[in-house]
A protein has these predicted regions:
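Conserved N-terminal phosphate-binding loop of PLP-dependent enzymes in the Aspartate aminotransferase
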Residues: 1-445
Length: 445
């Protein structure tokens, strides 16, 4: 058994796994039968364990390592900040925090002026909801069934998927169906029909819930964990129009889709819409240090000039996280990482995935933007029957064994590599998909 050296001590995968299972309590799982993958290190788009096994990362972990692992510029900025000031309370003014906020505001469309920093996407959504309620004096929040907004009180209640059910204690949350033409709730046959019917349905929800009671509509610009559900043309503009008509704050969750993932700094830019609040995390500094935030439009920022904002976090704007944000944004600009996500995603990855769909009947649909793509796997294209959990687990295991880390959710594979990935690495990943799908061809009826 090959052993890696860690802090001058030989370490094996088994030792690390045993330590984990003895003391670590994992999220979203039953603890008894867990067998976590052991990771020792990473660089760029690749990871490895303590025994020499390597993987190409097509997951970006939880869709956050947009700039790749161990980027030297980000590491250097973090080291410099460590030597200057490692922590400071959020009530102070700090250079790293101010520079990070300015860079984020500068990336946004005209009309945004302030950033409230959090530690992750969940508390970003939590505080955006709080801002909307304080700003409007209203209570209700509308959000989609096909969504995930985080695992804190209001964020998990706003979430639409199964994870909200055992945690649904927060008040004032109403859910609605967002567009998903492949499995339309509106019996639509075209994107235009899906858009029109989804907007008409949302209008009725607003009317029935009482417009003067609704503080916010919270949507992911492109629902991520729910399936990378790219909204049909005109839908987001229609939601913006409804929000304007009824005086509702529009919050767009860019936690997963933002900071280059779709080939633009913010996914909503491609839909021709500007929200009132934007929540972000993940790609803002690639998860090197936990960070998130709320990007605040000028009218809402001005409101809190003379109205008290009842919210805060001990580690809001942590200097180490802020230094990582500044370096990440600067490096992404200079190295044209966002442009790479657009070109590699739309011109290399997407055509490659579509070619796989032509070859393998278990692929029911390919969808996405940039390096935010999804494969929906089915046993019957005609019936759109999802592959079972057991089948998906087997496919995920085969991909891992072949050297590819995949992001698997229900019957889908989300193809979301770091935004620094090369065409050659995409070809390598597509070849692994091809070989594994061929092994499971019998699943398609």
């Amino acid at each position: 058994m090959k052993l890696a050296i860690h802090n001058e001590v030989a370490v094996s995968n088994d030792e690390v796994r045993q330590l984990d299972r003895a003391y670590v309590f994992h999220s979203w799982s039953m603890q008894g039968n867990l067998n976590p993958l052991v990771i020792a290190g990473a660089q760029g788009c690749e990871l490895w364990d303590y025994e020499g096994n390597t993987w190409l990362d097509f997951s970006s972990q939880l869709v956050n390592v947009n700039i790749g692992y161990q980027h030297p510029r980000v590491l250097a900025a973090m080291k410099a900040q460590l030597e200057t000031l490692v922590t400071i309370a959020p009530a102070t003014a700090n250079l790293a925090r101010g520079e990070a906020a300015k860079r984020i505001v500068d990336l946004a469309p005209a009309g945004f002026s302030k950033v409230f920093f959090t530690n992750a996407g969940a508390d970003a959504n939590e505080n955006a909801i709080r801002m909307a309620r304080l700003y409007t004096g209203r209570d209700k929040v509308l959000s989609a069934y096909r969504s995930y907004h985080g695992n804190t009180g209001s964020a998990i209640a706003a979430t639409g998927d199964w994870r909200r059910v055992p945690n649904e204690f927060s008040r004032g949350h109403v859910h609605f169906f967002n567009p998903y033409l492949y499995r339309s709730e509106f019996n639509a046959a075209t994107e235009e029909e899906e858009c029109q019917r989804a907007l008409a349905y949302l209008r009725r929800i607003i009317e029935c819930e009482g417009p003067t009671a609704i503080a916010a509509i919270l949507l992911e610009s492109i629902p991520g964990t729910a399936g990378i559900l790219v909204p049909p043309a005109g839908y987001m503009q229609g939601v913006r129009a409804l929000a304007d008509e009824f005086g509702i704050v529009l919050i767009l969750d860019e936690v997963m889709a933002g900071f280059g993932r779709t080939g633009s700094w913010f996914a909503f830019e491609q839909d021709g819409v500007v929200p009132d609040l934007v929540t972000f995390a993940k790609g803002v500094n690639a998860g090197y240090v936990p960070a998130g935030g709320v990007l605040i439009s000028e009218p809402i920022a001005r409101y809190f000039d003379d109205h008290f904002f009842a919210g805060g976090l001990t580690y809001s704007g942590h200097p180490l996280a802020m230094a990582a944000i500044v370096a990440t944004i600067d490096a992404m600009k200079e190295e044209k990482v966002v442009e790479n996500a657009a070109s590699i995603g739309n011109e290399v990855l997407r055509p490659g995935l579509e070619a796989l769909a032509e070859k393998h009947a278990i692929i029911g649909e390919v969808r996405g933007r940039g390096l935010f793509q999804a494969l929906e796997l089915v046993s019957s294209r005609e019936q759109k029957t999802p592959l079972t959990a057991a089948d998906m687990a087997a496919i995920k295991g085969a991909l891992t064994e072949a050297g590819l880390l995949a992001f698997v959710v229900e019957n889908r594979i989300h193809v979301v590599p770091p935004c620094t990935i090369t065409a050659e690495q995409v070809a390598q990943g597509l070849a692994i998909f091809d070989a594994v799908f061929a092994r499971f061809a019998s699943l398609a009826k």
